[in-house]
From Swiss-Prot:
Protein name: NADH-quinone oxidoreductase subunit C
Top-rank lineage group of the source organism: Bacteria
Subunit comment: NDH-1 is composed of 14 different subunits. Subunits NuoB, C, D, E, F, and G constitute the peripheral sector of the complex.
Membrane topology field: Peripheral membrane protein
InterPro entries: NADH_DH_suC, NADH_quin_OxRdtase_su_C/D-like, NADH_UbQ_OxRdtase_30kDa_su, NADH_UbQ_OxRdtase_CS
Listed Pfam families: Complex1_30kDa (PF00329)
Location in or out of the cell: Cell inner membrane
Lineage: Bacteria, Pseudomonadati, Pseudomonadota, Betaproteobacteria, Burkholderiales
Family (UniProt): Belongs to the complex I 30 kDa subunit family.
Entry GO CC: plasma membrane
Record keywords: Cell inner membrane, Cell membrane, Membrane, NAD, Quinone, Translocase, Transport, Ubiquinone
Function of the protein: NDH-1 shuttles electrons from NADH, via FMN and iron-sulfur (Fe-S) centers, to quinones in the respiratory chain. The immediate electron acceptor for the enzyme in this species is believed to be ubiquinone. Couples the redox reaction to proton translocation (for every two electrons transferred, four hydrogen ions are translocated across the cytoplasmic membrane), and thus conserves the redox energy in a proton gradient.
An example molecular function term from Gene Ontology annotations: NADH:ubiquinone reductase (non-electrogenic) activity
Length: 215
């Protein structure tokens, strides 16, 4: 099979998926395409029902959820330089994203929803739709503080017992808030406030005065 033939087949499959999504969601469809990938935007109140339709509709059949993750858009659009600023995101601060795979039809889809409340981000759990997202949702809760309504065991899964905060949030301090050390008097590991002093390191470059001359 030539490279051109393969690319044509992929584009044809992508167009078929677009048409099937249009037929399934009608006027509610919010679809974007970039780099040969499709992203479906879903309102938070339709999150569970839309994902259920993606799994059960014979024309879609996304029977496998490859990944679920949280995203914090707090600094989205700021850029590393002032001239790179593109403006803040127009939706909420927190999003939940799933990557789906249809083994039957051999196509993929990214689906994203936005938590409506930045202070208490919450969306419906997809555990009844794809049981494999159990620990994915616990991870997003642990790292971002996103609550998945209906999850039967929404506990932290990566951070330590008694951890305060959510370390993947953009406003969480890079050095953390506490550190661990062994206390010889208590003969156990204890927590204490972070003792790292924040500092900015500027590299120093030293060159000879004639560096680069005559080249």
């Amino acid at each position: 099979m030539s490279r051109f033939t393969y690319a044509y087949m992929m584009m044809t499959r992508l167009e078929t998926l677009k048409n099937n999504l249009q037929a399934a969601f009608g006027q509610d469809l919010a679809l974007t395409e970039s780099l040969g990938e499709l992203t479906l935007e879903v309102a938070a109140e339709q999150w569970f029902s839309a994902c259920t339709k993606l799994r059960t509709d014979p024309a879609l059949r996304f029977e496998s959820c490859i990944d679920l993750c949280g995203v914090d858009y707090l600094t989205w659009g700021n850029g590393t330089q002032p001239e790179e600023k593109t403006g803040p995101v127009t939706h909420g601060r927190y999003a939940v994203v799933v990557h789906l795979l249809s083994i039957e039809h051999n196509w993929r889809l990214r689906v994203r929803t936005w938590a409506p409340d930045d202070e208490f981000p919450m969306v419906s759990s997809l555990l009844e739709c794809w049981p494999g997202v159990n620990w994915f949702e616990r991870e997003a809760f642990d790292l971002y503080g996103i609550v998945f309504e209906g999850h039967p065991d929404l506990r932290r899964i990566l951070t330590d017992y008694g951890f305060i905060g959510h370390p993947f949030r953009k406003d969480f301090p890079l050095s953390g808030t506490v550190e661990m050390r062994y206390d010889p008097e208590q003969k156990r590991v204890i927590y204490q406030p972070v003792t790292i002093d924040p500092r900015e390191i500027t590299p120093r470059v030293v060159r000879e005065g004639s560096y680069g001359m005559g080249r």
